[in-house]
C-alpha cells in the first residue's frame, strides 16, 4: 500500500483508541456522581476512629518500672527515661518520662513491648501547634486522658464504616 494510506489508517486507529480511553474515564466519573460526598466538615464534624487507631500515647507513671524497653524498641530512640537507682531497695525509681510527638512516627512499638502496659494509644490525633517545642510531652502531659469525641456534644460524629452495596 501507499505510505500515506497506512499513516491515515494508523491515525484512525489512534483516534478510536483515544476515544475509547476518554469514554472509559468518563464512565468512571459518572459512576461516582451518585455517591455521597466523602468530605467531612472538620471543625464541626469528626470521624470516629477505630479501636486500633494509633493516636497520642497515654502514659501511666505509677505502672512504669523504668526498664527502658520502650527506648530500645523505638526505631528512633525517642522516649526519654530518667531514673535513679534506689540502693536500699535495689530498684529503679522513675524521675522523668517524655516523648516528643514532633519526631514520633506513631509506630506503636513502645506500647506493644511495654511489660507493664503503662503505655497505650489514644484516639487523640489533634496535636498541631504553632510552636514545635509544645509537642514535647512530659509525664504529666502524657498522663492526661483526652476528651472523647463521642462525649463532646458540640461536635457531630460520623461513623466511618465501609458502605455495603445492595
Swiss-Prot record:
EC class (word): translocase
SUPFAM superfamilies cross-referenced by the UniProt entry: 4Fe-4S ferredoxins
Catalytic activity, as annotated: a plastoquinone + NADH + (n+1) H(+)(in) = a plastoquinol + NAD(+) + n H(+)(out); a plastoquinone + NADPH + (n+1) H(+)(in) = a plastoquinol + NADP(+) + n H(+)(out)
Highest taxon above the source species: Eukaryota
The record's free-text note on cofactor binding: Binds 2 [4Fe-4S] clusters per subunit.
Main subcellular location: plastid
Amino acids binding [4Fe-4S] cluster 2: 74, 104, 107, 110
Cofactor(s) required, per the database record: [4Fe-4S] cluster
Any GO molecular function: 4 iron, 4 sulfur cluster binding
Segments forming domain 4Fe-4S ferredoxin-type: 55-84, 95-124
An example Gene Ontology CC term for this record: chloroplast thylakoid membrane
InterPro entries: 4Fe4S_Fe-S-bd, 4Fe4S_Fe_S_CS, NADH_quinone_OxRdtase_chainI, NDHI
EC identifiers of the protein: 7.1.1.-
Topological category with respect to the lipid bilayer: Peripheral membrane protein
UniProt xrefs under Gene3D superfamilies: 3.30.70.3270
Protein role: NDH shuttles electrons from NAD(P)H:plastoquinone, via FMN and iron-sulfur (Fe-S) centers, to quinones in the photosynthetic chain and possibly in a chloroplast respiratory chain. The immediate electron acceptor for the enzyme in this species is believed to be plastoquinone. Couples the redox reaction to proton translocation, and thus conserves the redox energy in a proton gradient.
Subunit structure, as described in the record: NDH is composed of at least 16 different subunits, 5 of which are encoded in the nucleus.
Record-stated family: Belongs to the complex I 23 kDa subunit family.
Name the UniProt record assigns to this protein: NAD(P)H-quinone oxidoreductase subunit I, chloroplastic
Organism: Chaenactis santolinoides (Santolina pincushion)
Lineage per the UniProt record: Eukaryota, Viridiplantae, Streptophyta, Embryophyta, Tracheophyta
Gene: ndhI
Amino acid at each position: 500500500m501507499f505510505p500515506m494510506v497506512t499513516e491515515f489508517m494508523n491515525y484512525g486507529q489512534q483516534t478510536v483508541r483515544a476515544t475509547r480511553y476518554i469514554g472509559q474515564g468518563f464512565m468512571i466519573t459518572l459512576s461516582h456522581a451518585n455517591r455521597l460526598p466523602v468530605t467531612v466538615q472538620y471543625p464541626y464534624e469528626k470521624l470516629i476512629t477505630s479501636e486500633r487507631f494509633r493516636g497520642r500515647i497515654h502514659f501511666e507513671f505509677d505502672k512504669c518500672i523504668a526498664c527502658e524497653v520502650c527506648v530500645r524498641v523505638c526505631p528512633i530512640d525517642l522516649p526519654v527515661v530518667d531514673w535513679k537507682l534506689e540502693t536500699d531497695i535495689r530498684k529503679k525509681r522513675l524521675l522523668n518520662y517524655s516523648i516528643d510527638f514532633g519526631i514520633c512516627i506513631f509506630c506503636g512499638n513502645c506500647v506493644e513491648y511495654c511489660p507493664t502496659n503503662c503505655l497505650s494509644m489514644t484516639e487523640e490525633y489533634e496535636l498541631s501547634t504553632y510552636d514545635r517545642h509544645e509537642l514535647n510531652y512530659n509525664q504529666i502531659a502524657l498522663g492526661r486522658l483526652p476528651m472523647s469525641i463521642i462525649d463532646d456534644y458540640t461536635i457531630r460524629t460520623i461513623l466511618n464504616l465501609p458502605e455495603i452495596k445492595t
